[in-house]
């Protein structure tokens, strides 16, 4: 999935906070849920505007960047 289709940054949306593209859901919120021990399905139920494909692609991209920097 194209990274531009996963997360977008627009100064008019939440002051430029990175959000899942096409939503007003901050990408950080997914990480907060996972850090709290909540499964991906709980996040997706709470934020139905974020698709499973977007969430998984975000996590894959984040992992790829972390591993590339290691």
Give short role names for the model-derived ranges.
Residues 2-41:
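A short, structured beta-strand/loop element
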């Amino acid at each position: 999935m194209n990274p531009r289709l996963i997360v977008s940054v627009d100064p008019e949306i939440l002051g430029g906070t990175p959000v899942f593209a096409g939503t007003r859901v901050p990408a950080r919120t997914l990480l907060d849920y996972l850090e709290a021990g909540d499964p991906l399905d709980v996040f997706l139920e709470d934020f139905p505007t974020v698709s499973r494909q977007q969430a998984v692609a975000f996590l894959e991209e984040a992992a790829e960047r972390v591993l590339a920097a290691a």
